[in-house]
């Protein structure tokens, strides 16, 4: 792999987008399996 590509992947906007996509997909899947839970008490 190119070092510039790895440096690009480690920048804040890319990490922020990946993290938001992961969080959104987790919430969507949890909402699919537990549709009546409006919040998740941890």
From Swiss-Prot:
The chain crosses the membrane at residues 8-28. It is a single-pass membrane protein. It comes from the Eukaryota. Disulfide bonds: none annotated. Keywords: Chloroplast, Membrane, Photosynthesis, Photosystem I, Plastid, Thylakoid, Transmembrane, Transmembrane helix. It comes from Rhodomonas salina. Belongs to the PsaJ family. The keyword Ribosomal protein does not apply. Pfam families: PSI_PsaJ (PF01701). GO terms for biological process: photosynthesis. InterPro entries: PSI_PsaJ, PSI_PsaJ_sf. This is Photosystem I reaction center subunit IX. It is found in: Plastid, Chloroplast thylakoid membrane. GO terms for cellular component: chloroplast thylakoid membrane; photosystem I. May help in the organization of the PsaE and PsaF subunits.
């Amino acid at each position: 792999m190119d070092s510039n590509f790895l440096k690009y992947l480690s920048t804040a906007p890319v990490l922020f987008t990946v993290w938001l996509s992961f969080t959104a997909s987790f919430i969507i899947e949890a909402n699919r399996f537990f549709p009546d839970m409006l919040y998740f008490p941890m």
